[in-house]
């Protein structure tokens, strides 16, 4: 008899996270590794825990996450977005507090593509008048 689980998909930059919340004791498992093993940076761990700490649910749920693509920062943001969506599925009244903290909105900023004739997306080659 499995407990009810809540699901949320989070995205940030090129990362996608699938988040499953189950009633439990506060375990966070990312790609079959603990959060401390997966993220070396403390800032990334803080970002992941933010929505759970905001609604005082750190000890209520076991969180199982699979995340793909992108780098450390993008993956942490995607996980935060996924946890937020799963929490809203669990209790819709949390939406207001999560929105006021800015976790509900998907951060749509992506890397701008490099253009032909330029060195980077916008950086032009040095101009010489003579």
From Swiss-Prot:
Coiled-coil portions: none
Q: Which GO terms describe its molecular function?
A: RNA binding; structural constituent of ribosome
Q: Which residue ranges does the record annotate as region Disordered?
A: 107-130
Q: Which UniProt keywords apply?
A: Ribonucleoprotein, Ribosomal protein
Query: Which biological processes are named by the entry's GO terms?
Result: translation
The reply to whether Cell inner membrane figures as a keyword in the UniProt entry is: no
Q: Name one GO cellular component term.
A: cytosolic small ribosomal subunit
Q: Bias regions of kind Basic residues — which residues?
A: 116-130
Which Pfam family would be a valid example here? Ribosomal_S9
* Source domain of life: Bacteria
The family note in this entry says: Belongs to the universal ribosomal protein uS9 family.
Query: Which protein is depicted?
Result: Small ribosomal subunit protein uS9
Species per Swiss-Prot/TrEMBL record: Marinomonas sp. (strain MWYL1)
């Amino acid at each position: 008899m499995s407990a009810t689980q809540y699901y949320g998909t989070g995205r940030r930059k090129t990362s996608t996270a699938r988040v499953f919340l189950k009633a439990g004791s506060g375990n966070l498992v990312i790609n079959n590794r603990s959060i401390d093993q997966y993220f070396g940076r403390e800032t990334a761990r803080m970002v992941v825990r933010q929505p759970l700490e905001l609604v005082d649910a750190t000890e209520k749920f076991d969180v199982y996450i699979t995340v793909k693509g992108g780098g450390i920062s993008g993956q942490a943001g995607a996980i935060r977005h996924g946890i937020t969506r799963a929490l809203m599925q669990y209790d819709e009244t949390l939406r207001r507090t999560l929105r006021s903290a800015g976790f509900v909105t998907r951060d749509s900023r992506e890397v701008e593509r490099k253009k032909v004739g330029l060195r980077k997306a916008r950086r032009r080659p040095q101009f010489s008048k003579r």
